[in-house]
Amino acid sequence: MSKVCQVTGRKPTRGYKYAIRGIAKKKKGIGLKVTGKTKRRFQPNLFKKRIWFAEENRFITLKLSTAALRTIDRLGVFAVVRKMRANGQSV
């Protein structure tokens, strides 16, 4: 599964894209009506990030979401990597 955050586990979710027509009620119209609905995927905001791992004196490359990057800033790289390894992921 390529579009999965290695830290938080965020992955694509499914949803719909709605086609609407009409004039909104606050513009004195009859309201917006749904005329169609198409399936779509909501992609997580992922990117590859190269992070210096000082405890092992090397860089590690992780596929992260923005929420995971904030988690790493808050907890530190060592705590996050320790939790990942406890869950069986290789880093």
From Swiss-Prot:
Matching InterPro entries: Ribosomal_bL28, Ribosomal_bL28/bL31-like_sf, Ribosomal_bL28_bact-type, Ribosomal_bL28_sf
A UniProt-annotated Pfam family: Ribosomal_L28
GO biological process, one term: translation
GO molecular function annotation: structural constituent of ribosome
GO annotation, cellular component aspect: ribonucleoprotein complex; ribosome
Keywords: Ribonucleoprotein, Ribosomal protein
Family statement drawn from the similarity comment of this UniProt entry: Belongs to the bacterial ribosomal protein bL28 family.
Protein name from the UniProt record: Large ribosomal subunit protein bL28
